[in-house]
Amino acid sequence: MPVEALAQKAKEKDKEKATELEQIVVTAAGFEQNVKEAPASITVITGEDLQKRSFRDLTDALRDAQGVAVTGVANERDIFIRGLPGSYTLILVDGKRQSTRDARTNGNSGFEQSFIPPAAAIERIEIVRGPMSSLYGSDAMGGVINVITRKVADTWTGSVTTDGTVQQHKRFGNAGQLSFYTSGPILEDTLGMQIWGRGLKRGEDKFLSGITGSREHDLTARLAYTPNEDHDFFLEGGTARLRRDANVGNTIALGPRAVSTYNDNDRDHWSFSHTGRWGPTTSDFSMLQEWAERRNYNYSQADGRFIKQPRAPEVRNTVIDGKFTTPFELGGSHTLMTGGQYFEARLSDQNPGRRTGRNETFSATQSALFAEDEWRMADSFALTTGLRLDHHEEYGYHLSPRIYGVWDATDMLTVKGGISTGFRAPDIRSIAPGYAYTTGGGSCTYGPTGTCGVIIADPSLKAESSTSYEIGAIWDNGDVILGGTYFYTDFKDKITNMPVVDAAGNPVRWSEDPNYRLWYNYNIDDAVIQGVELTATWNATADLTFRASYTYTQSAQKTGDFAGFPLARTPEHMANLRADWYTPVEGLEAWASVNYHGEEIGAGPRIPTNGKPVTINGKLGRKYDAYTTVDIGTKYDVGEGLTLNAAVYNLFDKEVEQTDFNAVGEGRRFWMSLTATF
């Protein structure tokens, strides 16, 4: 290899190493900080890392991250952070929330993580583990995932990527994806544009309860206007279309009542934002509107076509955010952030339990004020304190304080820890007066002795809340980085729904329609979640890096019908080991990873019969087996702007089937991508 090429290769590796040690994040405090100094437990995944792997949605991006579990049944895999389900994690794109789960009833998991940009448009993903409600309000109870996109380029640039996955076993569906990203100036130094989009198609699995077929399309455009050095304006609009197909004889069992079906899950959004610099103070303002709808279609043998079903839930969210960030000196250096938020959610849907067939409109409005200050008392110690006051039109006021300290004990050792609070507002269907939510599954029966039920909304429900304590340390000598965190979360007032029974244990019928069993929402469950997160990075040589992480999560419900069981089906143990190697061949990199997903325990009134039975305090739950998978891959810079990536996932073809795991894991599969950059 020529000397010049070797020198360039060394520079690139040194740059990547420096970037790893000095990553800048914004999610933990609302302004830019070094990741080690951030007042939270935070992981960063770079856009470059995403482009080396098969990346279709956030679950692909986060499967290696410490403290994060991707779990669930085949079509509802969701992101769990520190033992809390996906609905307790706030997903942001450039700091703007995505909250369209209410548009998808009776199974809303597995979709929200798809409404994100392609890998080429992403600069990094920041994952904050633990409550962040003092800054972000409701839904940030388990943590925050913030997808940060790339800045508008000074010169026109872009890329097109095509990738595909071929399954070794024909019972799994193959997949193909095409994505693009482009950015550049319209008026030099004044007006710029970004456009990105993608199309994805995955075949339906050919076995019962497998992964449904999918077709996904999205397109987003953004204008950036900078009239002078003190002001930036951004205008963005985007659309996404997700379709899921399930056919009789493939993922739906054969039977006299079985019908093939598909659903469309649409999301449109637009946003306007402004950043202003007013001397030492910086202001950030944004307004976001998002609209989402689900439509279901069933195949009619009589008509020979798919017929749209009458129910089509639609949600429209409006979010207005504003904040000011001001540095000042008073007994040390301060960075004070103050701001507020207005959030209105409007749901248009049938009231299914009342069987009127008419759409009704339900709404909920929240507003908030918050303040947070980072006080650097000394060069080696910073204390962050924050307080947020939220007001919800139904349940009233809620305070979310936090305090967090970061101490640079030595040049290599940083100790950090604090107390954070979180809360989650009840969803609209749980508190809308008069709403009756049907339950019981597609095979339930409606009648005087039927098994179908209705869950009655209760406007008096309280917000779920948590208090989390954590202490951790990071040791970094340049070649080796070690990190460890212990966390403890006290979870209160979990909202659950249970059937109402009489003294003899028989189901109570709903007085307004005795053909339904009666269910109610309750604030009854308290739980404790605790765990340990360990991580290590070793730059063994200039060409070889090892990364490892381990997460232990233990949770137990303290009250309710399932006391003693975990709060959610999260693996007790997770571990990951990854190696990255710059080979002696110019432009060629290789990687390998091992992922361990430990045993899970699930319990609840609707628990399926998969897995092994387990009894705690006289109640029956299910245990799901652990499994380990191995992946290998490579990246090759062909030259002339072309990059080739390839990987073998689940190298040893580990079977993860519904019967034992209550989940479906694809077998050995082969992935390849080709990116053209211009």
Residues covered by each model-derived region:
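Extracytoplasmic beta-strand/coil segments of soluble accessory domains associated
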Residues: 59-100, 123
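N-terminal Sec signal peptide and the immediately downstream disordered periplasmic leader
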Residues: 1-53, 61-63, 183-184, 225-229
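Gram-negative outer-membrane beta-barrel transporters
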Residues: 161, 324, 376-380, 487-490, ...
